[in-house]
């Protein structure tokens, strides 16, 4: 999904790559950046974000000013679902990441974007990781899904199938949509933490919106440099968890090896198409 920078824990990091959050070291400007991003997203997410995400914001009291102090955040999160947030210096190796998830620890980058990075940065920061991901971890069903994904990720390394499983994470945890009360809502962290994509994912005619299918999703390429051209829609968090837990991924990886990848924006005859996108946004960007 992303490229990590270091192959061994950098100075000051533990063997599992965790570091102290050192909350007191964040500057007033850094706290102000969190508040600016938080206010901007929360003003437009009601009616767009999944109910589980909005509940998580309230349960975890993320509306308090400033970057959350993990000592306080984790006390509430642990009581809700047994999860905790751990600070890391940046992107960590895949096996380390999966081990954290499998043990109900979510690694969060310990820095926040600069003003000139307000709408885009290559590496996820504390706002993306905590605002985008952690509210969903307060939901028991999604919390269990993330544990299952972490355990599955560790197993995938033995199959040489990491790039296939990464697509599941990308199209659910990062850029997933959910059907709620007859409408589409956002639950993916890459969307809820992005002002532009929170609108684009639901309102723009450009992207495809396709019903969730595990095999299809794990065949589908994705892009990391702009708004998505496909969004996959789950019917419920319970469905996502059940499919993940009940699937034997070994035979699935074998089957994936016999199938070609699906190009970005391609629609298959068997797809449950909710919205067939025009792909106009991607074409305009490609021609720019």
Which functions belong to the PLM regions below?
Residues 1-137, 217, 229-288:
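The feature captures two recurrent sequence modes
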Residues 116-120, 124-242:
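A contiguous, surface-oriented mixed alpha/beta subdomain in the mid-to-C-terminal portion of proteins
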């Amino acid at each position: 999904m992303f490229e990590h920078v270091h192959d061994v824990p950098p100075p000051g990091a533990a063997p599992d790559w965790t570091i102290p959050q050192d909350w007191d070291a964040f500057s007033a400007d850094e706290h102000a950046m969190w508040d600016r991003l938080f206010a901007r997203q929360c003003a437009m997410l009601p009616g767009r974000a999944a109910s589980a995400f909005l509940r998580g914001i309230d349960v975890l009291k993320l509306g308090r000013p400033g970057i959350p102090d993990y000592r306080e955040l984790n006390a509430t999160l642990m009581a809700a679902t047994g999860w905790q947030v751990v600070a890391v210096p940046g992107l960590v190796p895949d096996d380390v990441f999966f081990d954290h998830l499998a043990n109900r620890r979510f690694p969060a980058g310990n820095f926040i974007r600069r003003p000139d990075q307000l709408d885009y940065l290559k590496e996820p920061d504390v706002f993306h990781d905590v605002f985008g991901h952690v509210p969903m971890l307060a939901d028991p069903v999604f919390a269990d899904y993330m544990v299952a994904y972490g355990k599955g990720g560790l197993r995938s390394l033995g199959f040489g199938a990491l790039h296939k499983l990464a697509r599941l994470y990308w199209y659910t945890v990062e850029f997933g949509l959910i059907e709620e009360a007859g409408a589409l809502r956002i639950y993916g962290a890459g969307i809820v933490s992005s002002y532009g994509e929170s609108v684009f994912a639901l309102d723009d005619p450009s992207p495809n919106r396709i019903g969730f299918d595990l095999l299809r999703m794990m065949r589908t390429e994705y892009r990391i440099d702009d708004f998505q051209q496909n969004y996959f829609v789950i019917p419920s968090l319970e469905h996502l968890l059940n499919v993940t837990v009940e699937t034997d991924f070994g035979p699935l990886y074998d089957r994936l090896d016999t199938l070609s990848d699906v190009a970005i924006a391609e629609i298959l005859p068997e797809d449950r198409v909710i919205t067939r996108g025009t792909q106009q946004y991607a074409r305009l960007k490609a021609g720019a």
